[in-house]
């Protein structure tokens, strides 16, 4: 067993927006280590966001992430041969990770032509409290509410 918990590594802020959250989005979008391609996708998507909304892209993106981040999630716990979905609070770090993961996942599943358009529209939708990523958050919260009776099984 470990003696100490490993230290969390901080990602560097991206050069254009000077934001760690944007760097995390770049890392979430990136496939096969192609960071340059991921950066160009995100910066182009942010340009589209600015054109469509007329607001700074970083502001819209931060609002989208805040809207998507879940407060409660379900964890499966086995008690006496039965599996229970136990609602648990989400740590701030995990909330951010889940928010970014859901935005990238549902952007990829959209039916626009390019990933740039898909990501831009998913960010705009999330900032307006609509879209698939918001629906995922609401479904998670609904399931947690339905399983509230098992909250005493928390560990």
Curated annotation (Swiss-Prot):
GO terms for molecular function: rRNA binding; structural constituent of ribosome; tRNA binding. It comes from the Bacteria. The keyword Ribonucleoprotein applies. One of its GO terms (cellular component) is small ribosomal subunit. One of its GO terms (biological process) is translation. Keywords: Ribonucleoprotein, Ribosomal protein, RNA-binding, rRNA-binding, tRNA-binding. The keyword RNA-binding applies. One of the primary rRNA binding proteins, it binds directly to 16S rRNA where it nucleates assembly of the head domain of the 30S subunit. Is located at the subunit interface close to the decoding center, probably blocks exit of the E-site tRNA. Part of the 30S ribosomal subunit. Contacts proteins S9 and S11. Belongs to the universal ribosomal protein uS7 family. This is Small ribosomal subunit protein uS7. It comes from Ureaplasma parvum serovar 3 (strain ATCC 700970). The gene is rpsG.
